[in-house]
């Protein structure tokens, strides 16, 4: 076992305090299965040493297990992208209402389609040629498949939101309204269901905040109705 400790003073008497330490220990001393454990501890609020990062040799060759944080109320902040190459398990996924800025979002995003000159905050459908085009509910072909909200001018760079909180580029209705693909304006949604013969009635989400900001929960239904 090896320990590196970091001491300083508090602002009281002053008194000496240990503010952090690094502890290296044996995790498994079994011959042929040797593994170690490295623990990073910090003083947490009352001076008590608690684990902040624990790195442990796994139960198989080349496996390393890592535990970050201490109790459930601890916060881990990643300033940038996080890449998970296997499974991700999360007890809760928090969606926050988007801001007043068109294209602000939180949710599931794809980066494909090779489409440029998209309108940020407009609704698009995925075409049979592999590109995106603004929706319109006057025919099934322009709104019956995969739908998404453009998050910028280029689908492969800025992304297209498939589900989540997002700010669209128009005023669709009032708070709590059910929203439908619009038959009158390409790329829009509306709280008024299309009613013309041959029009498609498809729910795409709900208004969740001030209508003039265009904050919606975008979650297109997989079914639709054609007006007779």
Language model segments and positions:
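Beta-strand-rich receptor-binding modules of extracellular spikes/adhesins
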Residues: 1-87
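Glycine-anchored, exposed beta-strand/edge motif detector
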Residues: 11-18, 29-33, 39, 43, ...
